[in-house]
């Protein structure tokens, strides 16, 4: 293992160690972020969801799914995660859409405040839920999770930094609302904010 770390360091890579769990650390974050975004399409457009997400990431989930032809990946990984509960079920719309109608990152998009608030809370809810699960179950470390979300997934801040900045009261408001709207997802087993 030490040799692998040395090899990765010499080749300019940053390894993230993950426990033996369904989906690796960053996959759990990205795939559920995208799947939750697809569920949000019941009340917002792909472009509106991407615009709200840009507060936290450099490119919204639908823009990234278009780049990576990612719908089949989300369906596959979330289907695997259903072993942990039905709440991981892939959104049905992912199988019926080839390309999402969305904007380039940074483009102006009007998003009504009610939609913005709903989308923001749900995206943070799924991000925090998966972060809690990764840490509480020892799937990955806090440091790797925070670093990986920024470097590999394009988050402006790691999820633990976001929680710290929002504070425990706001994080728990978001999580309580998320749990009421999307029951079954992991909640924190210890304080993180």
Predicted features by range, described:
Residues 1-193:
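N-terminal glycine-rich phosphate-binding loop for ADP-containing cofactors
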